[in-house]
Amino acid sequence: MKKLILKSLLLFTTLLLTSVACKNLEEGEKFANDNLAKGGDISWLPQMEASGYIFYNDKGEPEDCFKILKDHGINSVRLRTWVNPSTHPQSGHCSRDETVEMAKRAKSWGMKVMINFHYSDSWADPGKQNKPKDWEGLNFEELKQALYDYTYDVMDALNKEGISPEWVQLGNEIPSGMIHPEGHTDNWAQLVQLLNKGYDAVKSVSPSSKIILHVDQGNNNERFRWWFDNAEKHGAKYDIIGMSFYPWWLEGKPDYKEVIDDLGNNLSDMANRYNKDVMVVEVGGEDSKPQNTYYMLRAVIEKVKAVPNSKGLGIFYWEPQGARSWSNYALSAWGRDGRPTKALDAFID
C-alpha cells in the first residue's frame, strides 16, 4: 500500500510540474511575442502635420497620428537623420534637432526608438550614397573624424533629453557601401573603418544601443552572404543584421508569396551564419491593395518570429502614414480618406 501511495504521489507531482512547465512556456512565448518590435519609419510625420494634413482614426475622427499607430499595434518608431538637410517637405528636414524632438514624442507615447543615420544631406539608398556637402574635400582621416563627431553629436543631443535609442542604424541600404567614393564596397577596408567609427561614437554615448547594418533585398541570400562575409572579414563591429523587403521594388514586381520563403530562409541563415539578431527594418506594400499588403505583413511577422533562438527582433513599415495624396508614395498604409488601411491591422491581429 505504501508503495502504491508513493507511486501515486510521484505521478501527481510529475503531472503538476509538467503543467507548470507548459504554462511557463506559454507565458514565455507570449512574452517573446509581446517583445517583438512592430514599428514604423514615420520621419515624414512632422512635415505632414506642418502642411496641415489631418490624420483620422478608424472611426473617421481627427486624432494624433501617434495614437492611431499605437492603437494599431505599433510599439516602435524609426527616425532617419540627415547631416545638413534642405527644407523640402519630402526630401528635406530630419535634422538633428528635428530628430530629437520626434524621439522625445515617441518616448512620450511609450514607444521604442531606432535612429537611422543616412550620412548624407538627403536620401541615401542603393542608387545613391552621396557624401554630405560639408564633408567634401576632407582627406580620409578627416572624413572618419567628421563621421565620428557628427554621430556623437546626434547621440549626445538625444542623451541630454534622457533618450537612449534601443537601436541605431549606421547607413541606409548600403549594399554598395556609404559616403561614396571613400566608403564604397570597392574598398572594404575603408568602408569598415567608417562603420566602426560610427559604432564607437554611438557606444561611447549609449552603450546599450544595438547597432544595425542594413542591406536591401532581404530575399536575396547570395547578396547578404557576400556583404556580411566581407564585413566580417574586415572586422566590422555591429549587433544586428537589418534588411529591407519590398516585393514591389524587385525585378518583375512579384507577389510576396513568390519570395516570402526566401526572406524567411535568409533571416534564419543570417542569424545562424553570423550569430546575430536580425530585423526587417523596412517593408512596404501597395496602398492600392491593402488586403494583399495585410497578408504580406502577417507573413513577414511570422517569418521573423520563426527565426531560431528568438533572434528575429522585429519589423518596421516604411512611412505607413505617408499617404500618397501628400507624398506621392505608392507603398504607404494610409488611404485617400486620411485613415489607415486594412494593411495596418496586421500589427494587431
Feature roles, as predicted:
Residues 30-112, 118-147, 153:
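N-terminal substrate-binding region of glycoside hydrolase catalytic domains
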